[in-house]
Amino acid sequence: MDTSVMAPTRRNLLLHIAGWALTASDAVAAVRPEPSDRPLAGAIRWDAWYMPGSEPTAAVERSLSPPQYQSRLPFFARRDAEDHVSLPALSPKLMDLEIEQAAYAGLDFWAFVGYPADSPMTVALRQYLASSMRLQIRFCMFTQIETWGTSRAPAPLIDEHIALMKDEAYIRVADGRPLYFLGFITAAKANEKWGGTSGLRAAIERFRACAVAANAGNPYIVLAGSPKEIAGLAPMLGGDAVGAYVISDVRGIGDYPELVRIAEAGWQTLADADMPVVPTVMTGWDRRPRVEHPVPWERQQRPGSGIEYYFGAPRPEELSAHLRRALAWIQSQPADRRAPATLIYAWNENDEGGWLVPTVPCDTRRLEALHATLARGQQGQQPNCTVAP
């Protein structure tokens, strides 16, 4: 990574956070969420797409360059006369357009994957926070447990996220609590980083107490991991609900209905925690681009190894039916185990096979399928893919 870029971007984000802390009202913790007759619906944002020349952007350009995968490219990707793929820098107008697209779909929030402030993976979050349109779709954070640091050295990112919770666009559940995902939790990581589950529980309790003391509110914390493992760990960790970033089978093969069967069985496994479950809705799972061209952060992947394991893509009506079942499943739970939201994998995990963002040249069918479920009867301009000048 280019360290000459990192320092100013971290400084800028910290200045933004300081500004929010100074201008936030003391009553921010009591902000009422917008009323709804259904659980909230959000989508994960994994933003490797927006910083040309960075390691993550170069990696996804490479993974989606083969002709058989180019149909997955997000709508803003460029292809030259020789079919070379490039991804442009994120502009304010491009972010505004994505906000409009997500709002049309009826999404309530994006769950930004949390990274240190100097990472190129935070470019989209910074651009979103600078947008005057951001209240059209709110946001929260989905944080990997690794980025929280350790018991001896908690990461600065923890305080940064508490400050973000005070932004007026941060999503809050029905009782006004800011929604927060802490993910990829395993017993091994708890032992390595936090001295065991008791140490991680103490860190979660400190996070909660610091958020309350900062007047950000009492976070509604969703503990996420593989369904079977997190269902066993979560009751010991002091969260409010359980969930998963993705629910699939790394050695699975089949059509989209088979992936849906696995995902929905995963909801039931998560329910073994005897806690509310935020069900994950899968838009797909097909990692073949990364199998053919491994990305730097997946060091164990060998080119071609496991190429046969993938699931077919959904038809729009199959995707919307899966989402409707997730919303109905939440409502079917006992009142004390009814989660406030469902989480969609994903807005833009295109090279892993999970996306909602329009793809080249302007395929908006997945957004239209969501609109029919989440925003039925609401007026809205059809999504387009033209970035304003």
Residue ranges and their predicted role:
Residues 7, 24-36:
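C-terminal segment of N-terminal export signals and the immediately downstream linker at the start
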Residues 16-17, 25, 67, 76:
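Low-complexity, intrinsically disordered/propeptide-like segments
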Residues 22-25, 359:
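Alpha-helical transmembrane segments and their juxtamembrane interfaces
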Residues 1-3, 11, 25, 349:
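Intrinsic-disorder/low-complexity regions
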Residues 3-20:
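N-terminal secretory signal peptides and thylakoid transit peptides that target proteins
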Residues 31-389:
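Glycan-processing catalytic domains of CAZymes
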